[in-house]
Regions:
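A charge-rich, low-complexity, intrinsically flexible signal that marks solvent-exposed coils, linkers
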Residues: 2, 40, 72-74, 162
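Core segments of cupin and vicinal oxygen chelate
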Residues: 8-56
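Active-site-proximal beta-strand/loop segments in catalytic clefts of secreted hydrolases
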Residues: 62-64
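C-terminal cap/linker of serine protease catalytic domains
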Residues: 128-162
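Conserved "turn/edge" positions that cap or connect secondary-structure elements
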Residues: 7, 54-55, 120-123, 130-133, ...
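Vicinal oxygen chelate
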Residues: 24, 54-57, 69-70, 74-113, ...
Length: 162
């Protein structure tokens, strides 16, 4: 069976990152760690790769060195069932030096970008009623962390005044 596993390049802290991610996201675990050997480019005995699962999907963290950095061109989209999950994921993933950006985007302390998205948000901004959809979109565009009740209220208010 063919599989695809995203490989995330870290500068020596891939195990620490994987430990954070599996502690935050349900149904997640570290499945394997390999280590640099004596004749390899990294420090002998330090983690080379970390295989882990997030929400049951495979990932690899590679401690490749400082040559490459994460950018917002790649992000992990994390679906949140409700506002409590949005708040929890945002808090835990930005703890220790992460940043909160616009429209639910965050960057964790390792530089990896995430989109913390309430499950209801795509329905609101994709509503078949263009007035509701636009109001929801405009509300979201003015936010940092998504407040799903405020987005819902904006959509409802737009219909009430239309």
């Amino acid at each position: 069976m063919t599989t695809i596993t995203p490989c995330l390049w870290f500068d020596g802290n891939g195990l620490e990152a994987a430990e954070l991610y599996v502690s935050v996201i349900p149904n997640s675990r570290i499945t394997d760690v390999s280590y640099y050997g004596a004749d390899q480019p990294g420090e002998e005995g330090s983690p080379l790769t970390v295989a882990f699962e997030l929400a049951g999907r495979p990932y690899t963290a590679l401690n490749g060195g400082p040559q490459y950095k994460f950018t917002e061109a790649i992000s992990l989209q994390l679906s949140a069932a409700d506002q409590g999950e949005v708040d929890r994921y945002t808090e835990l993933l930005t703890d220790g030096g992460g940043e909160i950006g616009p429209c639910g985007w965050i960057k964790d302390r390792f530089g990896l970008s995430w989109q913390v998205v309430p499950e209801e948000l795509p329905k609101l901004i994709g509503d078949p009623d263009p007035v509701r959809a636009n109001a929801a979109m405009q509300a979201m565009l003015g936010m940092m962390k998504i407040d799903i009740q405020a987005v819902r209220d904006a959509a409802d208010a737009a219909v009430a005044t239309a």
